[in-house]
């Protein structure tokens, strides 16, 4: 809105004051939201670093355990045990709200199973296979948790950028333009008032 595009009337001046007040209120709320989202992001980033370290450790552990199991039991036994495993883990995708941003919550409590619920026979298999399965169940849990956290971080980053753009638009474009238009109308009304006063004085003198 250019200053010269507005009508220099008192009603327009009142309307502009309302718009400025509303824009300033919105600007304040958006800044609070942006700052809150940034704090949330860095809090989750700290957790993400821990989870990433845990994921790397779980991956290394799983590789070691499966290597030991293969060397003791043989690859064929490991494969037949894997094929005997029953029921893929139930993954339930839910969501929750962080300052207006909907982020995923993945429920994966069924990943870890008791030994007697895994599907392969307990007789004829050693504890090395059980340990390998344990380590891979742990790895899957870490992968799911890492996916949840990284998706949350991406969504928060997207919303932080969107909120920053809105804050900047209000701060550097909308509010300055409205203020400029308000000042223009004020000055124009004062000028018109002086002209009217001068005109009335001339009429009285005449």
From Swiss-Prot:
What molecular function does GO assign, one term? ATP binding
InterPro entries (alphabetical): V_ATPase_D
Q: What is its main location?
A: membrane
Record keywords, A-Z: ATP synthesis, Cell membrane, Hydrogen ion transport, Ion transport, Membrane, Transport
Q: Which domain of life is it from?
A: Archaea
Gene Ontology BP terms: proton motive force-driven plasma membrane ATP synthesis
Family annotation (Pfam families): ATP-synt_D (PF01813)
- Membrane topology summary: Peripheral membrane protein
- GO cellular component, as recorded: plasma membrane
Cellular compartment(s): Cell membrane
The record's annotation in NCBIfam families points to: PRK00373.1-1 (NF001542), PRK00373.1-4 (NF001545), V_ATPase_subD (TIGR00309)
Q: Family, per the entry?
A: Belongs to the V-ATPase D subunit family.
Q: How does it assemble?
A: Has multiple subunits with at least A(3), B(3), C, D, E, F, H, I and proteolipid K(x).
Report the function annotation for this chain: Component of the A-type ATP synthase that produces ATP from ADP in the presence of a proton gradient across the membrane.
The name this protein goes by in its record = A-type ATP synthase subunit D
Species source reads Methanococcoides burtonii (strain DSM 6242 / NBRC 107633 / OCM 468 / ACE-M)
């Amino acid at each position: 809105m250019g200053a010269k595009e507005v009508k220099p009337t008192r009603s327009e001046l009142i309307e502009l004051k309302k718009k400025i007040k509303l824009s300033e209120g919105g600007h304040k709320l958006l800044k609070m939201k942006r700052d809150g989202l940034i704090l949330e992001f860095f809090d989750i980033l700290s957790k993400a670093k821990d989870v990433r370290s845990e994921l790397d450790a779980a991956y290394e552990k799983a590789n070691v355990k499966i290597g030991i199991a293969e060397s003791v039991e043989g690859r064929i036994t490991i494969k037949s045990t894997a094929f005997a495993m029953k029921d893929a883990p139930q993954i339930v995708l839910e969501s929750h709200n962080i300052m207006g941003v909907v982020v995923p919550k993945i429920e994966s409590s069924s990943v870890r199973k008791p030994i007697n619920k895994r599907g392969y026979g307990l007789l004829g298999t050693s504890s090395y296979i059980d340990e390998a399965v344990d380590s891979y169940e742990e790895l899957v849990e870490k992968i799911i948790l890492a996916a949840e956290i990284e998706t949350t971080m991406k969504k928060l980053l997207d919303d932080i950028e969107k909120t920053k753009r809105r804050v900047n638009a209000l701060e550097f474009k909308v509010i300055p333009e409205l203020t400029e238009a308000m000042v223009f109308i004020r000055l124009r009304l004062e000028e018109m008032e002086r002209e009217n006063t001068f005109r009335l004085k001339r009429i009285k003198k005449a």
